Amino acid sequence: MAAFTIRPAIPADAEALCTLHKAAVRALCLGAYSADEIEAWLRDREPARYRHAMTDGGQIMLVAELDGVVAAFASIRESMLFGLYVDPARGRGAGRLLLAAAEDEARRRGAAVLKLQATLNAVPFYRKHGFKRQDRSTVRRGGRDLAVLDMTKTL
């Protein structure tokens, strides 16, 4: 079996990141969120947003590639993990590897704690990797408030 390669995202990845993000949310979040919530969440997701995050948004985006295809991506700024999304057809450990790379990047940039707002379906994954629940909150996506859990991990 081929191994994943972790690398920084580049603007040319924006289309793949957008497609992967939508596929992951639609496949993995249904059950934790309604179909209407999911569509509101994804309503404004366009490749330009990912390019902006990489070039002007101050975020570091990392991708996990398998056989030259983006299988997962993570976005981090300072001590905040903004997202980690895995292609449901290509998982096989990509999330775990990408989370470790994001933690390393946060440490390298001086963070002592990594924070995130976990989707309800992702809480078990983050708990398994040492994150602790802090509080329940909401994020606004497409005009809807979506429930999330604030979580932290000491690095």
Name the predicted role of every residue range:
Residues 22-49:
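Conserved GNAT-fold acetyl-CoA-binding loop/helix
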Residues 45-62, 80:
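A short helix-loop-beta-strand connector motif used in the catalytic cores of GNAT acetyltransferases and
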Residues 1-15:
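Conserved N-terminal entry element of GNAT/NAT acetyltransferase domains
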Residues 74-79:
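A conserved beta-strand-loop-helix scaffold within acyl/acetyltransferase catalytic domains
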Residues 91-104:
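Conserved acetyl-CoA-binding loop-helix of GNAT-fold acetyltransferases
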Residues 84-91:
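A short, internal acetyl-CoA/4′-phosphopantetheine-binding micro-motif in the GNAT/acyltransferase core
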Residues 112, 116-123, 129, 136-155:
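C-terminal "cap" of GNAT-fold acetyltransferases
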Residues 58-72:
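Conserved beta-hairpin
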